[in-house]
């Protein structure tokens, strides 16, 4: 498992909450559906969707992650975890009601091939819910060594409109108060996190009415319609259903 894998028992609460929030958001679009979770990692998100009354197949290219998911999160065959390459799924066409793929597309070398494969296995009326880190400038040489490409919101939306007729853009960000926004604005060099001990950072967060990063819970993370500059991730819900 590489360094970006989220393992609930080992990953800091704040990072886990940020990732799980996308599954909570996706859950609102599904009930009693057949779901594909692409690049499911160790399977915690697939299990979350399965517990909400959906049939879920989680696929990941990493055999270690799939073994962990099968042992930790699968019960009576649900979710079903399968090792598979996201670009070559080996699944029948027009199979799934909803496909989720969170923080995956930026890792893909062949993005167009990946999206064509998603489109192939998704039902004509299906939903594709996808997220990627938000950056101000699109680039093909990211600082993150695990990423092959990154997009700003406009370019990411344009990419998805090449494959889907109806593309809705959302932003994921941390909940903020007026005071916390002011503190962030005046702390241009991010000195709080770079030089101040964690216990003091937590106190500052408490005073400003928010939780510090290491204590974030689901309610501290917001996914809202449109693009906001404070966002850390872009989330898109795409379909062809509304264009028939």
Model features per residue range: what roles?
Residues 182-194:
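Short, electropositive alpha-helical surface patch
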Residues 129-155:
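Short, glycine-/aromatic-enriched active-site segment of Class I SAM-dependent methyltransferases
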Residues 102-105, 131:
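Residues lining the SAM
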Residues 56, 128-129:
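A short hydrophobic/small-residue beta-strand
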Residues 140-144, 178-185:
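Short aromatic-enriched loop/helix-cap "lid" or pocket-rim segments at secondary-structure transitions
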Residues 112-124:
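A short glycine-rich, Lys/Arg-flanked "PGG" loop and its adjoining helix->strand segment in the class I
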Residues 107, 111:
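Di-metal (Zn2+ and/or Mg2+/Mn2+) metal-binding site signature of metallo-dependent hydrolases
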Residues 1-92, 98-102, 112-115, 150-158, ...:
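Conserved N-terminal segment of class I S-adenosyl-L-methionine
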């Amino acid at each position: 498992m590489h360094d970006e894998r989220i393992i609930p028992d080992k990953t800091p609460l704040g990072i886990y909450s940020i990732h799980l929030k996308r599954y909570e958001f996706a859950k609102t679009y599904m009930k009693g559906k057949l779901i594909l979770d692409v690049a499911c990692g160790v399977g915690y998100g697939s299990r979350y969707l399965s517990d909400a009354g959906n049939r879920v197949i989680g696929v990941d290219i990493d055999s270690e992650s799939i073994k962990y998911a099968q042992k930790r999160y699968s019960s009576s065959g649900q979710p079903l975890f399968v090792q598979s390459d996201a670009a070559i799924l080996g699944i029948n066409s027009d199979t799934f009601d909803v496909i989720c793929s969170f923080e995956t597309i930026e890792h893909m070398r062949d993005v167009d091939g990946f999206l064509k494969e998603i489109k192939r296995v998704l039902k004509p009326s299906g939903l594709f819910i996808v997220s990627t880190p938000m950056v101000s400038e699109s680039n093909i040489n990211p600082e993150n060594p695990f990423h092959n490409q990154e997009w700003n919101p406009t370019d990411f939306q344009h990419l998805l409109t090449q494959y889907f007729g109806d593309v809705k853009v959302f932003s994921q960000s941390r909940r903020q108060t007026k005071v916390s926004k002011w503190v962030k604005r005046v702390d241009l060099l991010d000195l709080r996190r770079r030089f101040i001990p964690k216990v003091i950072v937590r106190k500052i967060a408490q005073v400003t009415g928010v939780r510090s990063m290491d204590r974030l819970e689901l309610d501290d993370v917001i996914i809202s319609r449109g693009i906001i500059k404070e966002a850390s991730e872009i989330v898109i819900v795409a379909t062809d259903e509304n264009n028939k």
